[in-house]
Amino acid sequence: MRIVITIGGSILLKEYDNKKFEDYAKIIRQINEDHEIFIVVGGGRPARDYISVVRDMGETESICDEIGIQVTRINARLLQLALKDVSYPAIPVNFQQALEFSATGKIVVMGGTEPAHSTDAVGSILAEYVGADLVINATSVDGLYDKDPNKYNDAQMFSEVSADKLMEIVSDNDTKAGTYEFIDKTAIQIIKRSKIKTVIVNGNTPENVKTAITQPIGTLITE
């Protein structure tokens, strides 16, 4: 299968060390034995910190996005280094480059591409562009909920949810840089039109990404 894996920056950079990068590299190498892999990495805390500084300078949200994108590419480079020789030794800046790099048979790791696109959106667009069979979104919680589980104890997780229902849930969310709490509208629209199987899992345990390929786990988004 051709698989796109999106990994939130907060997953890889909960602590400023190499452990999570190495843990993910180990699992991804295992998956790569049987599948073709593309990876999209988010910005996490470093991106939020830099964006906060830029926003305090009075810059536009587009500039904030630009800074965030640069951070995602640094994070992507760190994961690419952890993967060593199984990964392509450069970070693509657009989807065409990602597809071209994949022709080498190497794992392709990338960060953001366009302003106002979350990691989820980039992963979904990449999946459509390269004709992926599966998207696995590694987040900081067990799946998708009807509201933020970090704020509400009564939040209910979906084992399966339609793209239309998801759109209702996120319709009131804003799109400020670095503030994506669920999965953004662009990602949902791409999932709906492309009909690519998408699974949301808890990425704090890297093994969950491998499990999602063959077993029910987290939240399955349906068209």
Swiss-Prot record:
Pathway: Pyrimidine metabolism; CTP biosynthesis via de novo pathway; UDP from UMP (UMPK route): step 1/1. Signal peptide: none annotated. UMP binds at residues 43, 65, 113-119. Keywords: ATP-binding, Cytoplasm, Kinase, Nucleotide-binding, Pyrimidine biosynthesis, Transferase. One of its GO terms (biological process) is UDP biosynthetic process. It is an enzyme of class 2 (transferase). ATP binds at residues 9-10, 44, 48, 139, 145, 148. Its main location: cytoplasm. It catalyses: UMP + ATP = UDP + ADP. It is found in: Cytoplasm. Gene3D superfamilies: Acetylglutamate kinase-like. GO terms for molecular function: ATP binding; UMP kinase activity. SUPFAM superfamilies: Carbamate kinase-like (SSF53633). Its EC number is 2.7.4.22. GO terms for cellular component: cytoplasm. Inhibited by UTP. The keyword Nucleotide-binding applies. InterPro entries: AceGlu_kinase-like_sf, Asp/Glu/Uridylate_kinase, Uridylate_kinase, Uridylate_kinase_arch/spir. PANTHER family: URIDYLATE KINASE (PTHR42833), URIDYLATE KINASE PUMPKIN, CHLOROPLASTIC (PTHR42833:SF4). Catalyzes the reversible phosphorylation of UMP to UDP. Belongs to the UMP kinase family. Homohexamer. This is Uridylate kinase. The lineage of its organism: Archaea, Methanobacteriati, Methanobacteriota, Methanomada group, Methanobacteria.
